[in-house]
């Protein structure tokens, strides 16, 4: 293994004791079989259950591949940004973000990885099976981004995306540290940036393996309203 891997997998984790063993077992097996040199960075975001203890057990078993850190709770978006910034700072060519609830299925990773040379940003295009409310929320978000921001993002909030760190570095400094729904903001900034090649991979998106969403639907809607206010302040000046 090289000191600097080819891929950093960023996985925010919050109260996922019901799913984390299943998720790590599947993802480590898939990544091992892919042939890429990777590290999986699990950022434990102040869980109140025994998630961190389970992560530490996994790290003891796979120290060469799994990195674990814990911190006070700051939310999913800020956890993702922390991982992206670390990938850029370490000079790692690619960063993959997945979630720890079992909805990001490892079986689709190979389809993403094949596109990395011809696309700078690759999003999962979800065939959602986790409820009509989430389906409507995704559709409304895409429409609102088209109308209000003038960008078409396939699935701006999808927790399954492969990005080149070179592309991320071009826009990361313009994404505020405390912004709500940080993945949405990053997707918008990347879409606005000239020269970045975008792609998508159709993915199944099953119900959560266990636990509860870190952002319930009513809070997601409130955050969506807030992020459009924040995006307005991030628009390029004429």
Predicted regions and their residues:
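A conserved acidic beta->alpha catalytic loop
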Residues: 44-53, 102
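Donor nucleotide-sugar binding loop of glycosyltransferases
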Residues: 16-19, 47, 76
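Cell-envelope/extracellular polymer assembly enzymes that use nucleotide-activated donors
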Residues: 6-8, 39, 185
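Conserved donor NDP-sugar-binding/catalytic core segment of glycosyltransferases
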Residues: 110-132
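Short, well-formed alpha-helical segments that are part of the catalytic scaffolds
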Residues: 16-31
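Conserved catalytic loops of nucleotide-sugar-dependent glycosyltransferases that act on lipid-linked
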Residues: 75-80, 84, 103, 131-237
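Short beta-strand-to-loop acidic/aromatic patch adjacent to the donor-nucleotide binding site
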Residues: 92-103
């Amino acid at each position: 293994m090289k000191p600097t891997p080819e891929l950093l997998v960023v996985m925010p984790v919050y109260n996922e004791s019901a799913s984390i063993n299943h998720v790590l077992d599947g993802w480590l097996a898939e990544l091992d079989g892919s042939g890429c040199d990777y590290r999986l960075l699990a950022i434990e975001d102040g869980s109140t259950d025994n998630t961190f203890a389970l992560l530490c057990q996994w790290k003891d078993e796979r120290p060469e591949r799994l990195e674990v850190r814990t911190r006070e709770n700051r939310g999913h978006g800020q956890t993702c940004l922390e991982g992206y910034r670390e990938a850029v700072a370490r000079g790692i060519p690619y960063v993959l973000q997945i979630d720890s609830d079992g909805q990001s299925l490892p079986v689709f990773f190979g389809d993403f990885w094949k596109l990395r040379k011809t696309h700078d940003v690759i999003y999962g295009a979800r065939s959602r099976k986790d409820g009509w409310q989430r389906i409507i929320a995704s559709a409304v978000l895409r429409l609102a981004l088209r109308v209000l921001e003038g960008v078409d993002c396939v699935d701006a909030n999808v927790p399954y995306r492969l990005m080149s760190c070179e592309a991320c570095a071009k826009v990361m400094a313009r994404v505020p540290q405390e912004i709500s729904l940080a993945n949405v903001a990053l997707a918008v900034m990347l879409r606005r940036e000239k020269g970045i090649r975008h792609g998508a991979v159709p993915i199944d998106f099953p119900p959560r393996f266990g636990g509860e969403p870190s952002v319930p639907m009513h809070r997601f809607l409130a955050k969506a309203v807030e992020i459009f206010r924040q995006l307005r302040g991030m628009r390029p000046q004429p």
